[in-house]
Amino acid sequence: MTGVPETVFEELKRYVGWGDGDERALRSLHGAAAPHFPRLAEEFYDRILGHEGARTALVGGESQVGHLKVTMIAWLDELLGGPWDEAYWDRRYRIGRVHVRIGLPQHYMFGAMNVHRTGLARLAYERFHGDPPELERVRNALGKVLDLELAVMLHTYREDLLAQQARVERLSTFGQLVGSIGHDLRNPLGVIETSLYILRTRTGEDERARKHLDRIGEQLGVANGIITNLLDMIRDRPLAREPVELAAVVGGAAESVRRPTGVSLALEGLDALPPVEGDPGQLRQVFVNLLENAVFAASPEGVVAVRASRADGLVALDVEDSGPGVDPATRRRLFEPLITTKDKGIGLGLALVKRIAERHGGTVEYSDRPGGGARFTVRLPA
């Protein structure tokens, strides 16, 4: 079984006294309750949307809520219909991960579960009030299965908390190192830059010398960029918010990224996007990092594309490449600092992309490109 270890669920089932009788009791309610599942899903998300702290997590608007309601109906169907085997619990675990991923605070999830507890108890009474012993069995089974569901949610949120703590500890150690060497590195680079300026004024028409000096200047820029990225990872620079035209931002990023002649680049749908509120410099960095990765993956011959779309108050930009994609072992930690798929990378680019996107109220996700390769999707509020 993937996800939560099997022993956790087996222990939980033994702890609450789960048995065959509970499964029979839930199935006996399923037929009468099924027509009411859409209403219960509506009530569940109405409760969540009624609280601003929970509502802000649902950045996808009506489309996202509509999808979640459909998922909730299937969740209710399986809740009462089973089978309550290892695959069932694994699916529950993945659903819990979705709520963690979208940033829905756990206390709202736990509170909203009361909608199902009271709603299903009411349906059980309507179905079995003439048979008190069966009503008692159904109510007990409902209590057990809903408590197990809450345990799954708690486990997923706990996993996320532990992962966050690990990231904070890594960044803290990393930050101490960067903070101590950043200033020391800037000083010699500044001396080199000053000397480079003086040398350029004295080379005259010597094209060969100028070519080498230009290379030195380029590498100075690379070194300064690495230091800047390192420092940006450990401090929160204030966002200089203003209306940003993403077509200009992405276009500028594309022009600044070097690519071999064998790698084609296509930009699609950018001109139709509305402005977003954000920091143009930081947003440009997002697409510079993603495009540099895409070009690297697609080289020496391949395809890179940026495709834009808009739906439900969000803009989505897919940065795709025809390279080898990302192996499954790396995907889970792809956006963590110091994780890289490049032989000579230091693993900051995607971590910085994630940080900037989230500071703009957006997200970044990885998926496989149809036909092979990688796709990184950046979503931002429009």
Swiss-Prot record:
Gas or ligand binding and heme iron redox state regulate the histidine kinase activity: heme-free AfGcHK and the heme Fe(II) complex are less active forms, whereas the heme Fe(III)-OH(-), Fe(III)-CN(-), Fe(III)-imidazole, Fe(II)-CO, and Fe(II)-O(2) complexes are active forms. The activation of the functional domain seems to be dependent on the formation of a six-coordinate low-spin heme iron complex. Mg(2+) ions, and to a lesser extent, Mn(2+) ions, enhance the autophosphorylation reaction, although the presence of a divalent metal ion does not appear to be essential for the reaction. Optimum pH is around 11.0 for the autophosphorylation reaction with the Fe(III)-OH(-) bound form of the enzyme. At pH 8.0, displays 75% of the optimal rate. Is inactive below pH 5.5 and above pH 12.7. O2 binds at Y45. Heme binds at H99. It is an enzyme of class 2 (transferase). Changing Y45L: 80-fold increase in O(2) dissociation rate constant. No effect on O(2) association rate constant. GO terms for molecular function: ATP binding; heme binding; metal ion binding; oxygen binding; phosphorelay sensor kinase activity; protein homodimerization activity. Residues 180-382 form the Histidine kinase domain. The modification Phosphohistidine is found at H183. SUPFAM superfamilies: ATPase domain of HSP90 chaperone/DNA topoisomerase II/histidine kinase, Globin-like, Homodimeric domain of signal transducing histidine kinase. Keywords: ATP-binding, Heme, Iron, Kinase, Metal-binding, Nucleotide-binding, Phosphoprotein, Transferase, Two-component regulatory system. Changing H183A: Loss of autophosphorylation. Does not significantly alter the O(2) and CO binding kinetic values. Binds 1 heme b (iron(II)-protoporphyrin IX) group per subunit. GO terms for biological process: peptidyl-histidine phosphorylation; phosphorelay signal transduction system. It comes from the Bacteria. CDD domains: globin_sensor (cd01068), HATPase (cd00075), HisKA (cd00082). Its cofactor is heme b. Consists of two domains: an N-terminal heme-based oxygen-sensor domain, and a C-terminal catalytic domain that exhibits histidine kinase activity. The coordination and oxidation state of the sensor domain heme iron profoundly affect the enzyme's catalytic activity. This is Globin-coupled histidine kinase. It comes from Anaeromyxobacter sp. (strain Fw109-5). The lineage of its organism: Bacteria, Pseudomonadati, Myxococcota, Myxococcia, Myxococcales.
